[in-house]
Regions:
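N-terminal auxiliary segments of SAM/dcSAM-dependent transferases
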Residues: 5-117
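SAM-dependent Rossmann-like transferase core, predominantly class I methyltransferases
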Residues: 82, 92-178
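Aromatic (phenylalanine/tyrosine) cluster motif
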Residues: 1-2
Length: 178
């Protein structure tokens, strides 16, 4: 809780919720394993009050996705890989992605150009909203109990990435999807 004084900008009253260049440089020097970076990312997300919810559900999942995807590894990579030592260039890439995520508050999906919807991967960037919607569950449940019969036509209008249309086409292969 912050008590603001009249005439004092909010930005001056709140604690710094960004990562300093010195801290990131120290991390690049000292953190050498995937596990180190995942732990550091979680601490940064929590310490800087980073909103989680554009494709991951908690700071650990967000950190795992950030580190592993930046390294071009699967999010479901074997746990043994967590002790792998990173090259300086890999550490720099993670630090830069983390800086953008924390300091610029860029959603991770935009930084990775990847979001999942209904279990399907989609390329995303700043031109579309990050796909996340309870509609994915409705599609998986085949819109039951609202639709009793297979739909013959499905229209996805102005939803951005087209993820709803693609997920519907996969779930209802006999329907015409526009």
């Amino acid at each position: 809780f912050f008590l603001l004084k009249p005439g004092v900008p909010v930005s001056d009253a709140l604690p710094a919720l960004t990562l300093s260049a010195d801290l990131l440089a120290e991390a690049e020097r000292e953190l050498v394993t995937i596990r180190d970076w995942m732990r550091f990312c979680v601490s940064c997300f929590r310490g800087c009050d980073v909103h989680i919810g554009h494709g991951t559900s908690d700071p650990f999942a967000e950190a795992s996705a950030l580190v592993l995807q930046t390294l071009n590894l699967e999010w479901s990579a074997d746990e043994e890989i967590l002790s792998a030592r990173l090259l300086p260039s890999e550490r720099a890439a993670i630090a830069e992605t983390l800086r953008k995520r924390v300091n610029d508050r860029t959603p991770l999906a935009y930084l990775l150009n990847l979001a999942y919807f209904n279990g399907l991967p989609f390329y995303v960037d700043e031109r579309v909203l990050v796909p996340r919607s309870p509609i994915a569950e409705l599609i998986q449940d085949r819109f039951l109990p609202w639709l009793k019969d297979e739909p013959q036509r499905i229209l996805d209008l102005c939803t951005g990435s087209g993820c709803i249309a693609i997920a519907c086409a996969k779930e209802f292969p006999d329907a015409v999807v526009d």
